[in-house]
Design a protein with these regions (language model features):
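Terminal presequence/propeptide segments associated with secretion/organelle targeting
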Residues: 1-652
Length: 652
């Protein structure tokens, strides 16, 4: 566990050398690789290799986090809320003491971060103490033909042939402590280094994952599952599908746009396809029916226990009532968030301007302005304008007109209902469509009224509408929060003899299992590993498809079969393998260890047949997809010619 890190707060990683090398997924490092890429130096397409420490590339927004200890603080947190009369009062009291406990950690030691997380729907609370390192540099990235082989087509699919890995290095000050980026920093020397195994695995071999899974909803009620399906999941499917089609068309046409939009397209499409698979799996695996059966058993238990009946008699009627009360508006809010908050980047810029603190210290203002201006590096105004028009149309067709924000009235009255004309005018008259205009806004002595800018003005209208919609369901949401907490607690008490693991919440978790294939449907069986043979098969099958395009020199290297010590027992090269470990988003980059604590590979995906895994674990069907560490080392040494990195590893 001392070698396992949270990578950027959104992925996982593992330390593999005495000089702070970290293995994580290619898609976890994708944004960093993209930021350093240009048409002239296309590290996304061609890969990147640092031949020396001096060539390693800094990433100002990136950090790694080491867990030092955990502590149960449930009594202290709940004691602060014992006099709360409403759910909102309870939340305020709980949040307040959680923040205080976290701050106490950093006050005692400024190099530490304390975070209190809720477990079991807010029935328990635990403090995690971390040490963060903010100087993390890119060392090695394979070309996307390795790290993203299969792209969207193969995403969430098995069999898989993706070398989804990248290599970074942690830097520290001369005392080996955390420090912001400085050319004077030196490679970090970790407390523990994960050894690497070249022995591989067999069917049934022990395998465990260690990482930082983001979130699951394993104990959510059936009412909550229905809301998830028909609300946020369906909104994501509909809206992102429209937005991504526009992005993809232009990315395929222009290399500069492909680089600019690569990271945001990758992030967007990942959860878009996840939502599609989740909704299908919920139906196919009868998740709702199973959850309702569990709820029926709980109803019987409540009826059979008078002391429980007194407390929980209205539990299910309250959940049903309040989920019903917010159903329509919650669905509209889901579309609102996808179409506007996560839609056109002009709106996102305007929202950040509205939140800009002009009274902050000069250093903070300059830093914030720099970050805002950097957003234009990955923005194409013509594409964003097309996206905005598409988002306006999509939202209008998906929700009742009473949920339309004020700008639709303007479109009707001033533009005769012509959305495209409105958008053309908006982008032509707003000053924040360019860095130059934004600079003018953010100068301290500006006399320009920000609200007079049409993009900022409409964003203010959006905030007002969003707040209004949220407020109208606040009471129902409070009752649901309380109901889900009581439901979670009741299920655990009904099965008091069982151990219930808590839902994922971005804290470190271990999952143990075995390497094993599975049967996706009747009459079919999938093996537990893939080899480079499948790369050639997919390249041939998908000839002309950019998702499966591979450089001739890589194909030549693979066809030479010069696998050396990285070959399996048959002399072939394993690429990926699967296990029945339990993972979710955030586990990407998680170390996959054998029983001796040696690294077998990195987890990077789940399988399509069990996409409802955030709601229910299906042991016979659910699989963790990992990239074999031997393939990683082969690519580093043979393709990247980076033998210097191989020498840093503890290979067994």
């Amino acid at each position: 566990a001392d070698a396992v890190v949270s990578f950027g707060g959104f992925c996982s990683g593992v330390v593999v050398s005495e000089d702070g090398l970290v293995f994580t997924n290619h898609h976890c490092g994708f944004s960093s690789i993209q930021q350093h890429s240009s048409v002239e130096h296309d590290y996304l397409k061609d890969g990147f290799v640092a031949r020396s420490l001096e060539e390693e590339l800094p990433n100002p927004e990136l950090y790694v986090r080491f867990l030092l200890r955990t502590e149960n603080v449930t009594k202290r947190v709940l004691s602060a809320a014992k006099h709360a009369k409403t759910e909102s009062e309870r939340r305020v009291a709980v949040d307040s003491v959680m923040n205080v406990i976290g701050m106490e950690v950093s006050e005692k030691d400024s190099t530490l971060t304390g975070i209190v997380d809720a477990y079991y729907a807010g029935n328990e609370f635990w403090l995690s103490v971390y040490r963060d390192y903010n100087d993390v540099r890119l060392v090695f990235a394979p070309p996307s033909s390795v790290g993203k082989f299969g792209w969207d087509t193969d995403n969430w699919m098995w069999p898989r042939h993706t070398g989804d890995f990248s290599v970074f290095r942690i830097y520290a000050n001369t005392q080996n402590g955390p420090a912001d980026y400085s050319p004077d920093n030196v490679p970090y020397h970790p407390e523990y280094v994960a050894p690497v195994s070249l022995e591989g695995y067999k069917e049934g071999s022990f395998c465990m994952t260690l990482g930082y899974p983001g979130s699951t909803e394993r104990y959510l009620s059936s009412y909550g599952i229905e809301e998830m399906m028909n609300g946020i999941n369906q909104a994501m499917i509909d809206v992102r599908g429209v937005k991504q089609a526009i992005w993809k068309r232009e990315m395929d046409r222009r290399p500069d746009i492909r680089i600019k939009y690569a990271s945001k397209y990758d992030e967007s499409s990942n959860y878009w396809k996840n939502s599609i698979g989740t909704n299908k799996a919920i139906q196919h695996l009868k998740v709702l029916e199973k959850k309702r059966a569990a709820e029926a058993a709980l109803r019987e238990w409540i009826q059979a226990h008078p002391e429980e009946r007194e407390k929980l008699i209205r539990l299910f009627s309250s959940l049903e009532l309040n989920y019903g009360n917010r159903r329509e508006i919650n669905r509209a809010l889901a579309y609102f968030g996808e179409a506007f908050i996560n839609g056109p980047e002009l709106v996102q810029l305007a929202l950040e301007i509205l939140n800009f603190d002009f009274e902050a210290e000069e250093k903070q203002v300059v830093s914030r302005m720099k970050k805002l201006l950097e957003k234009y590096d990955n923005l194409d105004t013509a594409i964003d304008k097309e996206v905005f028009a598409a988002m306006l149309k999509e939202y209008q067709t998906k929700v009742d007109k009473k949920y339309l924000p004020a700008m639709y009235d303007k479109i009707d009255t001033l533009y005769n209902g012509n959305i495209q004309a409105y958008v053309d005018s908006l982008y032509a008259t707003s000053n924040i469509t360019s860095p130059k205009g934004l600079k003018r806004f953010l100068e301290r002595d500006t006399t320009y009224n920000l609200i007079e800018d049409p993009a900022v003005s409409l964003s203010l209208d959006l905030i007002v509408k969003y707040y209004e919609m949220n407020q109208s369901i606040s009471e129902a949401s409070e009752q649901i929060e309380q109901g889900e907490r009581l439901f979670n607690d009741a299920m655990r008490r009904m099965y008091a003899d069982r151990n219930f693991y808590p839902d994922a919440n971005s804290t470190m978790r271990l999952s143990f299992g075995t390497v094993s294939g599975y049967s996706p449907f009747d009459g079919a069986t999938y093996g537990y590993y893939t080899t480079v043979k499948g790369i050639f098969e997919k390249v041939k099958e998908h000839a002309g498809d950019i998702d499966f395009a591979v450089q001739p020199e890589l194909l030549s290297l693979l066809s030479s079969r010069d696998f050396g010590r990285y070959a399996n027992e048959q002399g072939d090269m394993n690429v990926c393998f699967i296990s029945n470990n339990d993972i979710t988003g955030g586990n990407s980059g998680s170390a996959m260890f054998n029983g001796k604590g040696e690294l077998l590979g990195l987890a990077f995906d789940g399988n399509w047949e069990a996409m409802s895994s955030d709601i229910v674990f299906e042991p016979d069907l659910q699989r963790c997809i990992g990239v074999d560490v031997r393939y990683m080392l082969f690519i580093i040494e043979k393709y990247g010619k980076a033998g210097n990195l191989i020498k840093e590893l503890k290979i067994r």
